[in-house]
């Protein structure tokens, strides 16, 4: 533990804890007193970090509306409003996106399948650009108000920056913007394929966000829509069980991968997917406080 004021490592732990059970510390260098959650994105939150992390996990993983989550937690005696869920989502999802993206940098295949689907934002249809590799792993997601050359270039530029990889093959539909965008943002030597049957893989993969998007009945703003779509696909990709030859695994194997992938793949340095605070989406670290 380091001091949040002067970043000194010479800190001492105090005997007493906060009302929610967080450990307290004192910096010997500057005298600053702080606890486990000080300086983090949930520093002033009125609820335990583990409860907030579980709310956001269920919000992203399952088909629940903003009003469903408060009702589910009210049964356990935890009371909060749907506006609190919206606020927690806005605070935590950017950090979660960054952490999940860092975990898969350089691990994406070199055969990409790119397509766009429709998402309604504030009553208007927008284009959600998505890409996966041959094994079904997520490459990148980007929401755009238009379907043109600028949007295609921005998507490929973002995908290359996120993955750190230049693909060998890119399969798309026959839209006019793709050939030039691929040559400009990726490489002139990248093989571009436009067969509609070859691109059926990504079209089937749209079912994930389409199924989750249905109960929400659209988004109110472009910012919240972009943030949610990116975080949903990143978490879905992280938890999706895959085999080398087929994406269909036995039920027991899928359950094991879902309940215990964190011990093998997550860092054990005390910070989980959401760093900079005591929040962790790692299931073994969920505990009552």
Regions found by a protein language model. Give the residues of each.
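Two-metal-ion RNase H-like nuclease active-site motif
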Residues: 107-120, 130
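Helix-centered, glycine/charged polyanion-binding patches within enzymatic domains
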Residues: 174-229, 234-237, 241, 245-246, ...
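Major-groove recognition helix of helix-turn-helix-like DNA-binding domains
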Residues: 21, 80-93
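Basic, short loop/linker segments at the boundary and entry of helix-turn-helix/winged-helix-like folds
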Residues: 16-61, 87, 107-112, 149-150
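Active-site beta-loop-alpha junctions of metal-dependent nucleic acid enzymes
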Residues: 42-49, 87-91, 141-164
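Short, basic alpha-helical nucleic acid-contact segments in DNA-binding proteins
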Residues: 87-107
């Amino acid at each position: 533990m380091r001091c949040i004021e002067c970043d000194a490592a010479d800190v001492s732990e105090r005997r007493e804890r906060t009302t929610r059970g967080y450990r307290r510390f004192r910096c010997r260098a500057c005298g600053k007193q702080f606890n486990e959650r000080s300086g983090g994105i949930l520093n002033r939150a009125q609820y335990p970090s583990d409860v907030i992390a579980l709310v956001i996990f269920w919000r992203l993983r399952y088909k629940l509306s903003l009003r469903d989550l408060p009702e589910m937690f009210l049964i356990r005696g935890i009371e909060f409003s749907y506006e609190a869920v919206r606020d927690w989502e806005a605070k935590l999802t950017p950090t979660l996106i960054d952490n999940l993206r860092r975990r898969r940098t350089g691990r994406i295949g070199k055969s990409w399948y790119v397509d766009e689907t429709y998402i309604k934002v504030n009553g208007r249809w927008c284009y959600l650009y998505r890409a996966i590799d041959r094994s079904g792993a997520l490459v990148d997601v980007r929401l755009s108000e238009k379907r043109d050359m600028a949007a295609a270039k921005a998507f490929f530029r973002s995908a290359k920056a996120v993955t750190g990889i230049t693909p060998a093959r890119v399969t798309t539909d026959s839209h006019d913007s793709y050939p030039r965008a691929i040559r400009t943002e990726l490489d002139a030597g990248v093989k571009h394929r436009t067969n509609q049957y070859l691109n059926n893989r990504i079209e089937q993969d749209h079912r994930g966000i389409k199924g989750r998007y249905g109960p929400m009945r659209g988004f109110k703003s472009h910012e919240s829509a972009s943030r949610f779509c990116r975080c949903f696909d990143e978490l879905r990709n992280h938890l999706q069980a895959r085999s080398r030859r087929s994406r269909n695994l036995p039920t027991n194997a899928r359950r094991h991968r879902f309940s215990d992938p964190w011990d093998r793949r997550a860092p054990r340095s005390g910070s989980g997917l959401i760093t900079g605070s005591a929040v962790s989406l790692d299931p073994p670290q969920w505990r009552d406080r």
